[in-house]
Amino acid sequence: MEESKELQGFYKIFRAVIYISVLMEFFEYAIDPSPMGSIVCDLHSRIKQWMIYQDGNMAYSKIATFLLVCITCVGTRNKKHLEFDARKQVLYPLVSGVGFIVLSVWLFNTPMEMRVYMFSLNTLLYMAASVIGVVLVHIALDNISKFLKEGLLKDRFNFENESFEQCKDLQTNDYSVNIPMRYYYKGKFRKGWVNIVNPFRGTWVVGTPGSGKTFSIIEPFIRQHSEKGFAVVLYDYKFPTLATKLYYHYLKNKNAKDSKMPKGMKFNMINFVDVEYSRRVNPIQLKYINNLAAASETAETLLESLQKGKKEGGGGSDQFFQTSAVNFLAACIYFFCNWEKEPYDKDGNMLIAEKVQDKQTLRMIPTGRVFDKMGNEVEPAYWLGKYSDMPHILSFLNESYQTIFEVLETDNEVAPLLGPFQTALKNRAMEQLEGMIGTLRVYTSRLATKESYWIFHKDGDDFDLKVSDPKNPSYLLIANDPEMESIIGALNALILNRLVTRVNTGQGKNIPTSIIVDELPTLYFHKIHRLIGTARSNKVSVTLGFQELPQLEADYGKVGMQKIITTVGNVVSGSARSKETLEWLSSDIFGKVVQLKKGVTIDRDKTSINLNENMDSLVPASKISDMPTGWICGQTARDFVKTKTGRGGSMNIQESEEFKTSKFYCKTDFNMADIKKEEDGYVALPKFYTFKSRDERERILYKNFVQVGEDVKSMINTIQRYRVK
């Protein structure tokens, strides 16, 4: 604040009064007025009547001078010092000054015979100590005004402006996931909760390796959804890291007295590396693929999972060959689903189907009527083709083009899909045919392993992929292996695709399902955005974990990535590094808020303080990238809240529940003793198939592998025998 000339004048007057009071003290105590005439003596005697100048009251005089110094310094407006040192500039001078003042009183009362001119030595020393003491006290108190109390650089990283009130209350329901946390706000590290009250709107978790996203988010989803009676589908990229946790909670909640787990809940695993730990399942059957459209989607899933993100950016010819490959594979899938299909009851017992001969192909075609062994007409639980599974299809794809088309064209439903291929074959356009089918055969040949043939074989269909069926609920653990990621990922994608179509039905009658996929880019989740967007009514919670947006874009393509991140309602992030991820979180999730900024200007004559409000990032990108392990930030999806207003529609928008933020920036606060107790209770995973030795396992798998090829040869011979020439 700039001083006016009047204030400067008052300050000079007060400063002069200080030293006048010192001179008056010397006049009364140190000088003998008798040689100076009657006028001086009269003045001396009059002043002597003042209490502070009476004999023996020198201490009062010193106190009065000290008070004058204090009053004068209150109005001082010195130039501020950024590097203010209170000890050197205030404490040391003040203590020294008070010491000299006390010393001056002692010197005055200690007579010394030595004289200098008309004054005794002790009087001269008293006067010198008094002046030095007052000057030092004046300097010390004057320096206090040089202190800049505005706290420059006190909040160097802008923590105060970027901290905000977060949810302190636990909000729970039958489906919620609640994560205890602590957050900083207004000088306190407070306790709160991250309440994901609607997991059916989807959740994605992003963070660099080691940021704690699995421990902080994925594991609480497993723990709490298992406890609340969900059917859980879990993808374990590094088997058995998450598998042991899931199995622990399955056993814990199954055996609990107050368990919410549905009766009959089973635990299943799919593992293409250690087949002992795997159930067998057949996703290629009419139960899951009941029309040609479903076959086309299955084919598209398998092909895109093998290509993972390579579909985008191609021209018209690339799209033509891509579509041709999908149509060809779809024709093969649907053919095998229907070839010599037989009806079965719910217990897997074959029923008797009424059939008539097709005049064109001489094949026996079911009429639709089904009877049991007693001759009663019944409704079958499902139909199953004789070789309706993925191993037989993969083996069939290795046959010559001529043989493949001769077999497929015997099915009138798939024949229309074969037109372009047959034309190319008749015209000897082998390069075109290789472009349409050859790439598909190259990709799918990688899937033809002993393990995949064993697990996907139709004779080993151990469980139904509709894990949310109230009559037959189950947990499903889908395992992968980093060393065989692409191949196993494609096989797992096939299972997941058919599973999703089953659980995303039922008109809300299914039990709640939690699909948890950590390390999403290692698994191709076909049209996952569609599942997230439509699965709320069927109570399907989808949780996706990945490291960075560019990683997701590399495997799902830019369009696929955008579809995923824009349909998810709950967003959680650990530490991130990618520019795209940081900009998305800082700008689109957290946005900007009004912040109070303080500016201080110091020059020779004045110090100015400016306060202003402006919009700035609530959580800047640099703050997200610098988060330690265990810290998370993000935003949860909010459910409908009834609007409450006062008289005349008035509303305090700052206190209204409807306008409270669901954003969070916090440190997770788990009970580590409970987690340690949980980890100590982990048990070995179950083996579903037992082999006497590793060699026996290899013999059994190889025998099954060879048998599939023989089955395909037998099928081809049968069809060619009855084929109309």
Regions found by a protein language model. Give the residues of each.
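Basic- and hydrophobic-enriched, low-structure N-terminal and domain-boundary segments
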Residues: M1-S211, F215, P220, K228, ...
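Residues in and immediately flanking transmembrane alpha helices
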Residues: I13, V17-I18, H249, L531, ...
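P-loop NTPase motor domains
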Residues: E25, P35, S145-L153, V194-V540, ...
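N-terminal structured subdomain of primase-like DNA metabolism proteins
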Residues: F27-I31, L611, R638, R647-G649
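Hydrophobic alpha-helical segments involved in membrane association or supramolecular assembly
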Residues: V69-C73, R77, G97, G489-N497, ...
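A short, structural micro-pattern
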Residues: M261, I565-T566, D626-P628, E655-E658, ...
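Conserved ATP-driven motor cores of ASCE-family P-loop NTPases powering translocation/secretion/packaging/pilus
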Residues: I532-T534, N538-S541, G545-T636
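Low-complexity, glycine/alanine/valine/leucine- and proline-rich hydrophobic stretches
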Residues: M651-N652, S656-I675
